[in-house]
Amino acid sequence: MIELLSAAGQAIGNGPWQTALNTLLNEKSRQLTDVDGNARRLTALMNQLPDLLPSHRNLASGRIEIGTPEDLTETQHQALYDTLMAFRPWRKGPFNIFGIPVDTEWRSDLKWARIAPHLAPLQGRRILDVGSSCGYYLMRMAEANPQLALGLEPYPPLFCQYVLLQRWLKLPQVHCLPLKLEELPPMDGYFDTIFHMGVLYHQRSPHEALKQLASLLRPGGELVLETLVLDGDQDLALCPRDRYAKMRNVFFLPTVPCLEAWLNKAGFEDIRCVDRSWTTIEEQHPTPWINTESLPDFLDPSDPTRTIEGYQAPLRAAVIARRR
């Protein structure tokens, strides 16, 4: 694990953040190796797999393809299937891994298809993906040949999914750190593009989060923000009393005008909403590759336009803005 994190640190390069970042990564490596039970279990499973060399990969497909069935023996195929199932829940995808279709909870390819046409070219850019999960979007970004595509994923099981996939893909410009955004040392103006998707509604202080994102971007850099929003054109936000769609950690759902005001106050300009989409069962659904509930369980069974708590059903907006 330390080698992987060291490589990420080297890819980021030198700067005033280097000492603090190296110290933090050493501590995170120790936690993943010695303390976190899930990470130790998943690392042991990875180490039991033979070294598999994929003869094929396709990052441009909606379903990312790694290897073919012919790359494995029958015994290796069963062992790989069992290992992949042990890494559940698979949230972001989908994938085809050596002929094994991993049908993830989210059809992340649908979100990417909605957002990608509106992005500034990613080639040669330093990119940050906050809450990168298994790295699906990082892998889609890699197809554009950025200088660096760096993910932040603090949840050890999801970070270990990234480690497993990168073990086969070996994408040199793609890296991931097991950190929360607020743990990242100050790196003023380092990134050209930041993706912050499906995270803002989990922030107790969205304004502070947006200010930090602005500080990490160079002037003129691009923020790609996707979040749950409240339907309507008034400048207001919903603060759920307890849970929203069975999630305890949802703090604010702004309308799009309210979100645009937040972005303006945090130091962004040229703010444009490029997509508003109600979450559908096609995009988020239960599959054998998760062992948790999914969207049908979060909605009122007698009225799918409402959550189980009676709030508006999930509506997501994608907003792109430039740092002033």
Swiss-Prot record:
Catalyzes carboxymethyl transfer from carboxy-S-adenosyl-L-methionine (Cx-SAM) to 5-hydroxyuridine (ho5U) to form 5-carboxymethoxyuridine (cmo5U) at position 34 in tRNAs. One of its GO terms (biological process) is tRNA wobble uridine modification. HAMAP family: tRNA_carboxymethyltr_CmoB. It catalyses: carboxy-S-adenosyl-L-methionine + 5-hydroxyuridine(34) in tRNA = 5-carboxymethoxyuridine(34) in tRNA + S-adenosyl-L-homocysteine + H(+). Its EC number is 2.5.1.-. Keywords: Transferase, tRNA processing. Carboxy-S-adenosyl-L-methionine binds at residues 92, 106, 111, 131, 181-182, 197, 201, 316. This is tRNA U34 carboxymethyltransferase. Pfam families: Methyltransf_9 (PF08003). GO terms for molecular function: transferase activity, transferring alkyl or aryl (other than methyl) groups. The keyword Glycoprotein does not apply. It is an enzyme of class 2 (transferase). Belongs to the class I-like SAM-binding methyltransferase superfamily. CmoB family. It comes from Syntrophotalea carbinolica (strain DSM 2380 / NBRC 103641 / GraBd1). Homotetramer.
